UniProtKB/Swiss-Prot annotation:
GO biological process, one term: peptidoglycan turnover
UniProt keyword annotations, A-Z: ATP-binding, Carbohydrate metabolism, Kinase, Nucleotide-binding, Transferase
Taxonomic lineage from the root: Bacteria, Pseudomonadati, Pseudomonadota, Gammaproteobacteria, Enterobacterales
Protein's UniProt keywords contain Transferase: yes
Protein name as annotated: Anhydro-N-acetylmuramic acid kinase
GO molecular function, one term: phosphotransferase activity, alcohol group as acceptor
Disulfide bridge positions per record: none
InterPro entries: Anhydro_N_Ac-Mur_kinase (IPR005338), ATPase_NBD (IPR043129)
Keyword Transferase attributed: yes
Entries under PANTHER family matching the protein: ANHYDRO-N-ACETYLMURAMIC ACID KINASE
Organism: Shigella flexneri
Catalytic activity field: 1,6-anhydro-N-acetyl-beta-muramate + ATP + H2O = N-acetyl-D-muramate 6-phosphate + ADP + H(+)
Gene that encodes it: anmK
Pathway(s) this gene product operates in, as recorded in its UniProt entry: Amino-sugar metabolism; 1,6-anhydro-N-acetylmuramate degradation; Cell wall biogenesis; peptidoglycan recycling
Positions bound to ATP: 12-19
Pfam families to which the protein is assigned, alphabetical: AnmK
Amino acid sequence: MKSGRFIGVMSGTSLDGVDVVLATIDEHRVAQLASLSWPIPVSLKQAVLDICQGQQLTLSQFGQLDTQLGRLFADAVNALLKEQNLQARDIVAIGCHGQTVWHEPTGVAPHTLQIGDNNQIVARTGITVVGDFRRRDIALGGQGAPLVPAFHHALLAHPTERRMVLNIGGIANLSLLIPGQLVGGYDTGPGNMLMDAWIWRQAGKPYDKDAEWARAGKVILPLLQNMLSDPYFSQPAPKSTGREYFNYGWLERHLRHFPGVDPRDVQATLAELTAVTISEQVLLSGGCERLMVCGGGSRNPLLMARLAVLLLGTEVTTTDAVGISGDDMEALAFAWLAWRTLAGLPGNLPSVTGASQETVLGAIFPANS
């Protein structure tokens, strides 16, 4: 069974940077050693945003974007190696999620698409890459997401305490770690995605630092109720979603009914939308004693405060409190999934994704020996 140093690479729906994590992994433990966040050039970020909202690209443009993202991921890995004074031979493999540009797990031909050419990463780092983690699960009738609950269960489950892990990235997803029950998990809806999109359009800022804009505004209750009527929120699990659904166009359609509103009030309402949709799903799933939050949203003081109010009786904390950086959780999970793939172990949980069976995930892109 392969063990040693692994690198996880994650570029999520928030598009706030490429997260790269170095860890030692074996069958008994996962120990994080180092991490860094690598910036995404504005031009690349905009190209991904455009394609996620349905902008048409030529095959040439699509191929160029795939290559550019692969090179970006390789640059991020090489920066971490240099920082840690490590060579390619010191790393067993890289687990690279890729950049999701479309996720449509239902319909006549279910599919999900993550780009960022893994061949570019192998060629530029000299390290074996495991990628394309989601499509096998979809081929077996699953949602292909979320995949991180399996990792949360391995690291954070407790024999007697009802726990849930909440990742607030662009999309928010919940892992249900309830003693005596199968692991559950699904996407609750938008996390930071709509908040980030709004403040970017209105103020040219990538995100609402310390929730300053949202805290300066007031929740527009009719707008909140209008957004909460979206059918996704009442859809039963298993379910997953992404930027192709909850995007700026979605927000604009709801705002048409509310002309002339204060932009800060919209920001406050979007924060409340995220908090309410998460808390409702926690309660519908039976509640928990401890909710451990990770992802960029765990650094949003307004979101954390609202979750504590909406979930009275639940200890709301970050995963940092149990020794796992909330900023690095997803990248660490894909390093772990790469380890499982190389070990021939399944990486999905049918109780989460709805797949017909457990399966080894991903494709292996071997480096030259």
